[in-house]
Amino acid sequence: RTEGAHAGYRIADRTFELPEVKLLVDLVQSSKFITTKKSRQLIGKLEQLVSKNDAKKLQRQVVVADRNKTSNEKIYYSVDVIHSAIAENRQTRFHNFDGNVRKEMQLRKNGRFYQVSPWLLTWDDENYYLVAYDADAGKMKHYRVDKMLDLSAVDQARRGQTDYEQMDIASYSRKNFGMFAGEETTVQLLCDTSMTGVIIDRFGASVAMRPYDETHILARAQVAVSPQFFGWLAGLSTHIRVISPDSVVNEY
């Protein structure tokens, strides 16, 4: 409570400081997973966590671009359904889609439903993924949440608990470039020394590396051999080259 001519009440302390809220706003702005409409709604709610003056400062800095934002408004419903299914130990089913050349949604598997046992939601490379057990394939798989339609929980108990408990999600994410599956293989990469940071960022600080000569290093890592891995290599082809095993060299 304040005294004097302008007596009244003021908030002595706030849970969030302006830099903290600004960080959250930046994350919402840059997230491809969150639609433009939802981004503006969330930022409006975040502005309520700071004073009116600080909120005005945020508003002057906020620009929500449509570029690379998803258009699937059902994502938030999907996340809620998945969380509930995990908590209730239930399976889920959904349609999965890709975009065609006309930028239209095209259902995968000829429109058949996917039915899986959900175990984890994870964030990777600016996208949200469901990690789930596919009983037909007998293994864990991953699915982009923004590519799901018609998602619902199924009154069947989840399967694959042993597979999930044996799973190292951090290692799994590192090996599955772009979160597309492929055969797991240990590869050896010949890299410019300037690529040391790139290798650590991609494979983690525990990646095996050693000097090769004055300008190169050798790195060994387990990866999921897939078009996404080869695409990553192609983007760095003048600096990083796969040299073994021969099967991967020949496939690339």
Listing of model-derived features with the role each one plays in the protein:
Residues R1-A12:
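Minor-groove-contacting beta-hairpin "wing" of winged helix-turn-helix DNA-binding domains
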Residues T2, T122-D124, Y212:
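Short beta-strand micro-motifs enriched in acidic
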Residues A5-A7, E126, D146, E214-I217:
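Beta-strand-connecting loop/turn residues
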Residues R10, R93, Y129-V131, L218, ...:
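General beta-strand recognition
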Residues I11-K103:
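Bulky hydrophobic/aromatic content
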Residues D13, K147, D155, C191-T193, ...:
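Non-catalytic surface loops within mature trypsin-like serine protease
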Residues D66-Q188:
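Core beta-strand-centered patch of the WYL/Sm-like small regulatory domain
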Residues I169-Y252:
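Polybasic (Lys/Arg-rich)
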